[in-house]
Amino acid sequence: MHEGNRSPRPMRMEAKTVKPRHPLVSRLAELLVSTWGEYLQLEPYHLPADLGFVEGQLEGDRLTIVNRCYQSRVFRKLHLELATIGPNLDILHCVMYPRPQFDLPIYGTDIVASTQMVSAAIVDLSPVRGELPPAYLAGLEPSFARCTDFGQLRNLPPWGTIFSPRCVFARVVTPTEADLFMEISRAYLRFHCEQAARAEAVDTATEAQILAGQRHYCEQQQQNDKTRRILAQAFDEAWAERYIRTVLFDLPQ
């Protein structure tokens, strides 16, 4: 099942891009792009012109950031960020923000990878109105149960109360673990897109609750001081704050 009645359109690649060194980052980016193109009717989402492709310096290393943003009937913003720092570090960040008219959780995934290993790989569907819906708890359970196969599961940060009981957060050391993270990510993403295709608009009172929940999600994510510190070092504090509030975790209106 796909969103709307028209045939899905492929995503148009941005003119400027980065080439991740770690294969898991490339594989996950390709999965996100292809799945969005398969399930969703995509329209452009316009970022400020100076924030789509960004270059800076971080402790002598070149920092390059490329953002791709789209929207659809159900999602107000589909954001994929790819970044490289120097010759050895890759970062992937993705959030799928539903429109507040639809009672859906927020899909998010991040990878931080060096050439040797993935120090952090996370995927989740974060609830915005109470608990994660029963359909999601049940639908994600078979894939979530496999997270015990990771050798090193990680603890969530103190501000991570926004994440769900189905959150997978691990270090990825071996090719087998990389395949496992891809399989879990694919299952989560496809399940979410299938649920989105069936989503119907909610009443005004429920929409207000969803809007408040999405704002809380963004406010909690904005507390990630590590992201702010890296961006401030590469650019400056004012730029970092604008980028976080405009590109990464903008509050829905």
UniProtKB/Swiss-Prot annotation:
What family does the Swiss-Prot or TrEMBL record give for this protein? Belongs to the HY2 family.
- What protein name applies here? Phycocyanobilin:ferredoxin oxidoreductase
Gene Ontology BP terms:
phytochromobilin biosynthetic process
Report which superkingdom the organism of origin falls in.
Bacteria
- The UniProt record lists the EC number as 1.3.7.5
Q: In Gene Ontology terms, what is one molecular function of this protein? A: cobalt ion binding
- Reaction catalysed by this chain? (2R,3Z)-phycocyanobilin + 4 oxidized [2Fe-2S]-[ferredoxin] = biliverdin IXalpha + 4 reduced [2Fe-2S]-[ferredoxin] + 4 H(+)
| One of the Pfam families matching this protein, by short name | Fe_bilin_red
- Which NCBIfam families does its entry note? PRK02816.1
Q: Which PANTHER family match?
A: PHYTOCHROMOBILIN:FERREDOXIN OXIDOREDUCTASE, CHLOROPLASTIC
- Give the UniProt keywords, A-Z: Oxidoreductase
Q: What class of enzyme is it?
A: oxidoreductase
What is the role of the protein in this entry? Catalyzes the four-electron reduction of biliverdin IX-alpha (2-electron reduction at both the A and D rings); the reaction proceeds via an isolatable 2-electron intermediate, 181,182-dihydrobiliverdin.
- Keyword flag Oxidoreductase: yes
